[in-house]
C-alpha cells in the first residue's frame, strides 16, 4: 500500500438529491474558497478555503443559563454580556486554528464552515449517491468557487470519469486560463455566472473585474469542448437588469455562439449567514425582483434567439 498522502479538499456542504444543479438527480458538492466577494452572496461562509467559525444565536442556549463555552477560547475572542450572551471579536476569531468554542458546544451554536475530505472519501460519497441517480444524474461541483481548489478537484473528476459519472460545475470562471482549461477537459456540463458586463460595475459589487471571466467564457465557447454550457445571471434590480446590460449580454452571447441562459431572481436567503459570520449584509433592504420584469427580460432573450430559463426552469 502506498504511503503517499492523498490530496485533501475543504468542503462546506454536500447535498444529495439535487434537481436544479444539472441534468437529472445529482449530488452537489460545495467547495470552499472564492476570489469574488459579491455583496449579495448566499454562501459567504465559502469565501475562504481555511476553516472558520459561524455563530448561530438561535441555536445558542445562553438564555437557559448554558455556560459550556465559557473560558474555552484561549485567544480572547469570546466574551459574554450581562445577559450571558456570547460576544465575539471577529478580528481575533478569524485567525483561530483550534476552535475550542466549536468543540465545546453541545447545540451547534458554534460551527465550522469547512470539513476536509480526501479524494477517495469524497468519491466514495459520490459513488454511494449514484445509486439514487438512475441513468441521467451525476455530480455537480459548486461553491464558493470550486476551481480555486483545482488540484483536488482535478483528481476527483478523473476518478468520477473512471466510473462514468457525469460531471457538472457551477463557476464564476474567475481563475487563470491554465486552471480553467485543465479542469474543463473533464467537465460535461457547466453553469457560468455573468454578474455584469461593465467591468467597473462588476468590481463595485463583486470585488473583482470581469475581464478574466469573459475571456474564459469566450475561449471555452470557441474551443473544441463538447460539453453543454448555460450562462447564469443573478438578476438584481438596479444593478444588472438595465436594458443596456441585457443588450451587452446578448451581444456577447451572439459573438460567441452561446445559446442558453438562466435568469436567477435575487433573494436574501443568505442574510442569516452574514450575521452568523459577523458581517454586514448590505442587501437587507433590497426587494425581490418583480416577476413581470423577469418575464420581460426573458422575452428579450427569446426574441434574440437565445433559450432563456427563469429560476429553476432549466431544460434538463
UniProtKB/Swiss-Prot annotation:
Locate the 4Fe-4S ferredoxin-type domain: which residues? Answer: 84-115
Q: Which of this chain's residues are annotated to bind [4Fe-4S] cluster 2?
A: 60, 66, 69, 105
The residues that hold S-adenosyl-L-methionine are 40-42, 144, 193-195, 267
Q: Where does [4Fe-4S] cluster 1 bind?
A: 34, 38, 41
Q: Which UniProt keywords apply?
A: 4Fe-4S, Iron, Iron-sulfur, Metal-binding, Oxidoreductase, S-adenosyl-L-methionine
Q: Which InterPro entries match?
A: 4-hPhe_decarboxylase_activase, 4Fe4S_Fe-S-bd, Aldolase_TIM, BssD/PflA/YjjW, Organic_radical-activating, Organic_radical_activase, Radical_activat_CS, rSAM
EC identifiers of the protein: 1.97.1.-
Q: How is the cofactor bound?
A: Binds 2 [4Fe-4S] clusters. One cluster is coordinated with 3 cysteines and an exchangeable S-adenosyl-L-methionine.
Example GO molecular function: metal ion binding
Q: Where is the Radical SAM core domain?
A: 20-307
**SUPFAM superfamilies, per this entry?**
4Fe-4S ferredoxins (SSF54862), Radical SAM enzymes (SSF102114)
For activity, the cofactor(s) needed are: [4Fe-4S] cluster
Q: Does the keyword Iron apply?
A: yes
Catalysed conversion reaction: glycyl-[protein] + reduced [flavodoxin] + S-adenosyl-L-methionine = glycin-2-yl radical-[protein] + semiquinone [flavodoxin] + 5'-deoxyadenosine + L-methionine + H(+)
Q: Kindly give the NCBIfam families that the UniProt entry links to this protein.
A: HPDL_rSAM_activ, PFLE_PFLC
Physiological role: Catalyzes activation of 4-hydroxyphenylacetate decarboxylase under anaerobic conditions by generation of an organic free radical on a glycine residue, via a homolytic cleavage of S-adenosyl-L-methionine (SAM).
Q: What's the family?
A: Belongs to the organic radical-activating enzymes family.
Oligomeric form and interacting partners: Monomer.
Q: Which PANTHER family match?
A: PYRUVATE FORMATE-LYASE 2-ACTIVATING ENZYME, PYRUVATE FORMATE-LYASE-ACTIVATING ENZYME
What name does this protein carry? 4-hydroxyphenylacetate decarboxylase activating enzyme
The species is: Clostridioides difficile (strain CD196)
Amino acid at each position: 500500500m502506498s504511503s503517499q498522502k492523498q490530496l485533501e479538499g475543504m468542503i462546506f456542504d454536500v447535498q444529495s438529491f439535487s434537481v436544479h444543479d444539472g441534468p437529472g438527480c445529482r449530488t452537489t458538492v460545495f467547495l470552499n474558497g472564492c476570489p469574488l466577494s459579491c455583496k449579495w452572496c448566499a454562501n459567504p461562509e465559502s469565501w475562504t478555503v481555511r476553516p472558520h467559525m459561524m455563530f448561530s444565536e438561535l441555536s445558542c442556549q445562553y438564555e437557559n443559563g448554558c455556560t459550556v463555552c465559557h473560558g474555552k477560547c484561549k485567544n480572547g475572542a469570546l466574551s459574554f454580556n450581562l445577559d450571558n450572551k456570547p460576544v465575539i471579536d471577529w478580528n481575533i476569531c478569524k485567525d483561530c486554528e483550534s476552535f475550542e468554542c466549536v468543540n465545546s458546544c453541545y447545540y451547534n451554536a458554534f460551527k465550522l464552515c469547512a470539513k476536509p475530505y480526501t479524494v477517495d472519501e469524497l468519491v466514495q460519497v459520490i459513488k454511494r449517491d449514484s445509486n439514487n441517480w438512475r441513468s441521467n444524474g451525476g455530480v455537480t461541483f459548486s461553491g464558493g468557487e470550486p476551481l480555486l481548489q483545482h488540484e483536488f478537484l482535478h483528481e476527483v473528476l478523473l476518478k468520477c470519469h473512471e466510473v462514468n459519472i457525469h460531471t457538472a460545475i457551477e463557476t464564476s470562471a474567475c481563475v487563470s486560463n491554465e486552471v480553467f482549461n485543465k479542469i474543463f477537459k473533464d467537465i460535461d456540463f457547466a453553469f457560468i455566472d455573468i454578474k455584469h458586463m461593465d467591468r467597473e460595475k462588476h468590481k463595485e459589487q463583486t470585488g473583482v473585474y470581469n475581464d478574466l471571466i469573459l475571456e474564459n467564457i469566450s475561449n471555452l465557447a470557441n474551443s473544441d469542448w463538447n460539453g453543454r454550457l448555460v450562462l447564469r445571471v443573478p438578476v438584481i434590480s438596479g444593478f444588472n437588469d438595465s436594458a443596456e446590460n441585457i443588450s451587452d449580454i446578448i451581444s456577447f452571447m451572439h459573438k460567441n455562439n452561446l445559446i442558453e441562459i438562466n435568469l436567477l431572481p435575487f433573494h436574501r436567503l443568505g442574510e442569516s449567514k452574514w450575521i452568523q459570520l459577523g458581517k454586514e449584509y448590505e442587501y437587507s433592504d433590497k426587494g425581490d425582483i418583480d416577476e413581470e420584469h423577469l418575464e420581460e427580460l426573458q422575452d428579450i432573450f427569446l426574441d434574440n434567439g437565445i433559450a432563456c430559463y427563469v429560476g429553476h426552469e432549466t431544460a434538463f
